[in-house]
Amino acid sequence: MKTKLNELLEFPTPFTYKVMGQALPELVDQVVEVVQRHAPGDYSPSVKPSSKGNYHSVSITINATHIEQVETLYEELGNIDIVRMVL
């Protein structure tokens, strides 16, 4: 039996995205720009480089107000050209 994400969450709730992308200076700015469109706020994302330094992982936590917001952000963050994966 599959459990859907919206069945596990009670809104509003803190929700963290981990965005993996190319190690370019604009990665963090592009992630924050997309998040600001759907969940305006003051964000201080954390950034971790990969072991070889080719990729960066950007973690950012929002205060999610509904499941559609969570799903839209997954989609739009994944559409950033230099992003490889969103968890």
Curated annotation (Swiss-Prot):
Which SUPFAM superfamilies does this one have?
YbeD/HP0495-like
Recorded GO CC terms? cytosol
Indicate the family of this protein: Belongs to the UPF0250 family.
- Official protein name in the record: UPF0250 protein KPN78578_06520
Q: Which domain of life is it from?
A: Bacteria
Species of origin reads Klebsiella pneumoniae subsp. pneumoniae (strain ATCC 700721 / MGH 78578)
